[in-house]
């Protein structure tokens, strides 16, 4: 099978898998900047019923969302490195979690550190 046909078959299978799901009830997961992105979506999309942020980074969260309490359950699991860091980003996350209307579970792992990773080397030979 040619590469293009193989890629198309993978996307067709993924589309079938998504179509079989109830997209009116979404749960989201995000790490680091992705954690901020899922916080933003969870606050603005009524289909989202819960969210799990792993070392949530608050930079992508808009001012509009910061002003509005989150209404869905949010589980925050942080590294000790970030949970015990009292910088601006940690303060923003603490404020967001404190004013949330839905249940919030905020935990951190003792002696843990934030892990950074990127897919850029897989997307471009110039990135790796």
What are these regions (language model features)?
Residues 1-29:
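Gly/Ser-rich "nucleophile elbow"/oxyanion-hole loop immediately N-terminal to the catalytic nucleophile
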Residues 17-20, 42-43, 66, 98:
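A general structural signal for stabilizing positions within well-ordered secondary structure
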Residues 21-24, 46, 70:
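Structured loop/turn residues at beta-strand edges in well-structured enzyme cores
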Residues 29-34, 38:
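Gly/Ala-rich beta-loop-alpha elbow adjacent to hydrolase catalytic centers
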Residues 34, 43, 117:
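Active-site-proximal loop/helix segments of hydrolase catalytic cores
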Residues 40-49:
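Conserved hydrolase catalytic core segment
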Residues 49-115:
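The feature captures the conserved acid-bearing segment of alpha/beta-hydrolase catalytic domains
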Residues 113-126:
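Catalytic histidine-centered segment of alpha/beta-hydrolase-like enzymes
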């Amino acid at each position: 099978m040619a590469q293009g046909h193989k890629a198309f078959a993978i996307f067709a299978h993924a589309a079938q898998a998504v179509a079989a799901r109830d997209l009116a009830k979404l749960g989201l997961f995000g790490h680091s900047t992705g954690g901020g992105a899922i916080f933003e979506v969870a606050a603005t999309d009524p289909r989202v019923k819960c969210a799990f942020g792993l070392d949530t980074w608050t930079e992508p969260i808009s001012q509009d969302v910061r002003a509005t309490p989150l209404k869905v359950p949010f589980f925050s699991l942080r590294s000790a490195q970030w949970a015990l860091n009292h910088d601006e980003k940690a303060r923003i996350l603490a404020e967001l979690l404190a004013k949330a209307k839905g249940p919030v579970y905020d935990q951190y792992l003792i002696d843990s550190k934030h892990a950074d990773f990127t897919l850029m080397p897989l997307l471009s030979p110039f990135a790796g």
